[in-house]
């Protein structure tokens, strides 16, 4: 059976603000199944934001597991991410899940993969999914050459990715946190 897939998730950290945004398109093979999916969410008392790329059902399973890890570790992002990655790598059922998570709190931004990787990216810029390279290129150019806010960079870069990538649309969901975690 074909997987639901294709998306773009972008996270930018600038100043005291971190933002994660994503498009709303869900694709099955060559067909757009839904155009307004929410692939970015607030977790753990609204102190963590997370987005996913990959299989939709798989990602929802991982969101639930990640939120449980956040609860278990009192919202400590890095510890929860490492514990989820351990489970993901070693659990026979979880290993089959095909998704990548981008997560952030007021202090750290991370990529969590099914290979058990927890990666803190350079320059706190995360771009995942089929439109990730387009969004990353646009965001880097905007970060280096403008004074735009993190939210404005995410909006503009995702719009550019949506104009280029056939698996990405311009129906955006954007969540932001400042240094107080709000």
Curated annotation (Swiss-Prot):
Subcellular location: Cytoplasm
Keyword presence, Protease: yes
GO terms under biological process: proteolysis involved in protein catabolic process
Biological source species: Legionella pneumophila subsp. pneumophila (strain Philadelphia 1 / ATCC 33152 / DSM 7513)
Pfam families from the UniProt entry: Proteasome
Family from the record: Belongs to the peptidase T1B family. HslV subfamily.
Protein name: ATP-dependent protease subunit HslV
Functional note: Protease subunit of a proteasome-like degradation complex believed to be a general protein degrading machinery.
Enzyme class, UniProt record, top EC level: hydrolase
């Amino acid at each position: 059976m074909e997987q639901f897939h294709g998306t773009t998730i972008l996270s930018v950290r600038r100043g005291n603000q971190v933002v994660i945004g994503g498009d709303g398109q869900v694709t099955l093979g060559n067909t757009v199944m839904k155009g307004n999916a929410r692939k970015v969410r607030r977790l753990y008392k609204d102190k963590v934001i997370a987005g996913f790329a990959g299989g939709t059902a798989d990602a929802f399973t991982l969101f639930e597991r990640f939120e449980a890890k956040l609860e278990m570790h009192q919202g400590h992002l890095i510890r929860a991410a490492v514990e989820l990655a351990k489970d993901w790598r070693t659990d026979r059922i979880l290993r089959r899940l095909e998704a990548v998570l981008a997560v952030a709190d007021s202090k750290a931004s991370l990529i969590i993969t099914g290979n058990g990787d927890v990666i803190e990216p350079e320059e706190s810029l995360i771009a995942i999914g089929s439109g990730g390279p387009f969004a990353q290129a646009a965001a880097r150019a905007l970060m280096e050459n403008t004074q735009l806010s993190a939210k404005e960079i995410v909006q503009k870069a995702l719009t550019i990715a949506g104009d280029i990538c056939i698996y990405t649309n311009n129906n955006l969901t954007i969540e932001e946190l400042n240094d107080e975690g709000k």
